């Protein structure tokens, strides 16, 4: 037996200075071969060509008050069998452990230990030739009270920084994008504009990455806000999905955006969930044009390109002959379109309800410009504050939920048979609604991310 060995109990307080961990309670288990430490939001990245990993650590069991953000070089990735017999592939890091007045380097596997009794497990490999375990004792190297632990972490919480949030978009000068960047910075976060077309992906089971033009790796952002223009839907959703695979929070998920961008599919989902929509028709062949027109109640009617946005690709056909001509012309171009009843009693007006996390934060009434039937702000429409009914509120909230969107612009038209859903937008513009209402919607979007990630200002 070596004279250098020291006695430890079945539980001890450890420290990892290189990780910024001044105190963490460990379960000492000589029956376990490897050691592990609690880690969530684990994200691999490269530093000077070497594999690294970042992770978050809540060092105090059953407490989320203290969050440490740690980084370490990866020394391995191994299949580890847990106490319940399940195998998990974990990142392995090496760091110097301090136990009492002793210090040496140990290997740690990273895993979520929320369901365990301790934030750390000290296994026999880390203790080999260093310690003797007395399982009948606890804290042989000294106990730490709650006050002492809080004081040790007091410096850490005081220095807590904001989140790093990426805005996935195409034009940094658009009002909505400028406001989101501004709102995030005002709340103490690091905001990064990421041009979707300049991002590219590395698909690799062991080290997936998102790169930015020039080679910068983007795996270290805490969250992303997708603001994907229609022409970039496929690539933008693929990019968002890749961030999600890295456990990076997306304000709106790729699945939700994809659902909402498919106008036909979204109407089918709304219909399936018993949410009222204008009567609409969809057909493949020009042979069915006459029946399609009759199906929606005849002319006047609306013809919509399924790929259109901001009022573009939407035509009012005032007569049956005009409707047939427009539909057949579009069909000859091999584009997909919807035919929809025209709600004449709306008189060129509709509602835009801005929904965040299942609540309406602002509503406006949009009025079409003279001689125009489309109320979109981008088509010259005007916006004014409006009070929405309980039925309209319920319809907007249910529509956003059906799409799976945490942030949505829900368009509703008032008809003689009640409110009808027109469209659900996953990247709603902010200028018209913020200008009309004076509400800080961009700030509410940032707040949604803060709540989801459990972040609070100092």
Curated annotation (Swiss-Prot):
Cofactors demanded by this protein: Mg(2+); Mn(2+)
Record-level GO BP terms: protein modification process; SOS response; translation
NCBIfam families: PRK10446.1, rimK_fam
Keyword Zinc: no
Gene behind the chain: rimK
Stretches for region Unknown: 1-162
Top-level taxon in the UniProt lineage: Bacteria
Location of the ATP-grasp domain: 267-450
Annotated TM spans: none
UniProt binding sites for Mg(2+) 2: 423, 425
Principal EC category: ligase
Identification of the protein by name: Probable alpha-L-glutamate ligase
Molecular functions (GO terms): ATP binding; metal ion binding; ribosomal S6-glutamic acid ligase activity
InterPro entries: ATP-grasp, ATP-grasp_RimK-type, ATP_grasp_subdomain_1, Peptidase_aspartic_dom_sf, Put_Zn_protease, RimK, Rimk_N, Rp_bS6_RimK/Lys_biosynth_LsyX
Alphabetical keyword list: ATP-binding, Ligase, Magnesium, Manganese, Metal-binding, Nucleotide-binding, Protein biosynthesis
Positions with a binding annotation for ATP: 304, 341-342, 350, 374-376
